[in-house]
Each structure stands twice: as C-alpha cells, then as structure tokens.
Amino acid sequence: MTNDQVTALIDRHIDGWNRRDPTLLASNHAEDGVVLSPMFARVRGRAQIRDSYAALFAAFPDWQMQFGAPIVDGNRVAIAFSVTATHQGDFMGLAGSGRRCAFEGVSLYQLDADLLIKEERRVYDFTGLLAQVGVVRIRPAS
C-alpha cells in the first residue's frame, strides 16, 4: 500500500462527500467496515454505513465539507474537516428547523489490505451541533 494509493482512496471519499453520494461514500468502506461517530454511534457494515450517509444528507441536504491535507502513516489516515449545513429534514427526532450549523472535526481512518476503510472514527463537537439546530440548549457559563 503506497501513499499514492491511500491518497487516491481519500480523494474518492472526499469526492463522495462533495457529491453527497451515500453509495459512492459507502463503496470506500470495507463490507464489514465500522464507522464510529457522535451522530450515529457505531455503524457496522457497508449497507448500514450507506444508510447513515443517506440519513445525514436527508437532514442536511446542503451539507458542505472542506478538508485539510490528509496525514498518511501506512494504513492509517487523519484528516481535518469543517462543515456547514442547514438543518432541513428530520434529525434526532427534530423536524427541519432551517437553522444553519457549522463545526470542525477530524476523521481517523484505518484501511484494510484491499485499500478500503475498515474503521472510520469521527471526532467533533456534537453537543455544539445539537445546540445549533435546537435539539439541546446550552447555558452560558457564569
């Protein structure tokens, strides 16, 4: 597995995010892959991963991501991202609010021998996202 091969996979994955294409995104994951994220907890298997992407884009149809340069170390990749989106569909039991949200995070990937994502771990301020779309209220510190 070369850095160029890994970078090509990450480029395909970024393309899937930019197109908001659940099928393309899921195709980059191993059949038994796992995604760990604050939003969906643990999602296992390509079909469920695809469904989680579809649910995300249904709730936030204008979802936009910007990515930093990937950091590649063998079969591991880290990439920073920022998101802007408008809450327009069901999310966490809340109907679309029309509220804009923005947050930053990091995705950590572990790839398998077939150059597919075996595990993806997303780290971001989920409580801040929930507050921005009106699911929770946060009191300012006194």
Label each region the model flagged.
Residues M1-S142:
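C-terminal and inter-domain tail/linker signature
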